[in-house]
């Protein structure tokens, strides 16, 4: 069954494997999450657990939110997410979910919001090639052809300049290099989406080989 936890991306560093290989890793700090609700097929139509991450001040939450977390005997949470395909019987409302649910060598999917880049052209946004920079081409970083003459319009999905970044992206099949239970850290091989201190969702890989 699947497992999941919420955390924050701290940054990147590198560690050495036993054979001397240098492994770039992303450090994710996942302080204990709290199970706020168990959803079942009978009551909600599907099975899932709802977890909360990071306390926030009571004055920043309304009465329904305060009542919801009171059932778990915890403080209001800044982030609340659901994890499906989990064994609901293993969890109880108010239980803490810690990094120790994962082990070294586990394969995971990490979801986050990519860094916002603002308004960008087609070369940076879509990786298109630029035109010649000399010999009077007068065509350097422009989008290029908008399409054939016949339809008298530009087709949808045409790659054009525009807002880049700020998208929800999942990177699949990342390997956990180390689990530090004392400091609530996960060291994940490779990079994960988002800026430093960004919220990330770590869960068991859905397409693990």
Curated annotation (Swiss-Prot):
Cysteines engaged in disulfide bonds, as pairs: none
Tree of life domain: Bacteria
GO MF, one example: structural constituent of ribosome
Region (Disordered): 125-148
A single Gene Ontology CC term: cytosolic large ribosomal subunit
InterPro entries: Ribosomal_uL3, Ribosomal_uL3_bac/org-type, Ribosomal_uL3_CS, Transl_B-barrel_sf
Biological process, per Gene Ontology: translation
Signal sequence region: none
Entry keywords, A to Z: Ribonucleoprotein, Ribosomal protein, RNA-binding, rRNA-binding
Protein family (similarity comment): Belongs to the universal ribosomal protein uL3 family.
Subunit and interaction comment: Part of the 50S ribosomal subunit. Forms a cluster with proteins L14 and L19.
Job description of the protein: One of the primary rRNA binding proteins, it binds directly near the 3'-end of the 23S rRNA, where it nucleates assembly of the 50S subunit.
PANTHER family recorded: 50S RIBOSOMAL PROTEIN L3, LARGE RIBOSOMAL SUBUNIT PROTEIN UL3C
Protein name: Large ribosomal subunit protein uL3
Species this chain originates from: Lysinibacillus sphaericus (strain C3-41)
Lineage: Bacteria, Bacillati, Bacillota, Bacilli, Bacillales
């Amino acid at each position: 069954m699947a497992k999941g936890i919420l955390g924050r991306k701290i940054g990147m560093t590198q560690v050495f494997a036993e054979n001397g290989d240098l492994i770039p890793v992303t450090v994710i700090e996942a302080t204990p999450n709290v199970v706020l609700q168990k959803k079942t097929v009978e009551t909600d139509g599907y099975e899932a657990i709802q977890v909360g991450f990071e306390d926030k001040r009571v004055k920043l939450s309304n009465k329904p939110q305060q009542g919801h977390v009171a059932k778990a005997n915890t403080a209001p949470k800044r982030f609340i997410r659901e994890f499906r395909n989990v064994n609901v019987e293993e969890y109880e409302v108010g239980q803490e979910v810690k990094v120790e649910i994962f082990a070294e060598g586990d394969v995971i999917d990490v979801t986050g919001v990519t860094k916002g880049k603002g308004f960008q052209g087609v070369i940076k946004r879509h990786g298109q090639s630029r035109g010649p920079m000399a010999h009077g081409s007068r065509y350097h970083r422009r989008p290029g052809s908008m399409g054939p003459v016949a339809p008298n319009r530009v087709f949808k999905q045409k790659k054009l300049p525009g807002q880049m970044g700020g998208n929800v992206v999942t990177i699949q099949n990342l390997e956990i290099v180390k689990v530090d239970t004392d400091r609530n850290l996960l060291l994940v091989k490779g990079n994960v989406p988002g800026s430093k201190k960004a919220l990330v969702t770590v869960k068991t890989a859905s397409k693990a080989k």
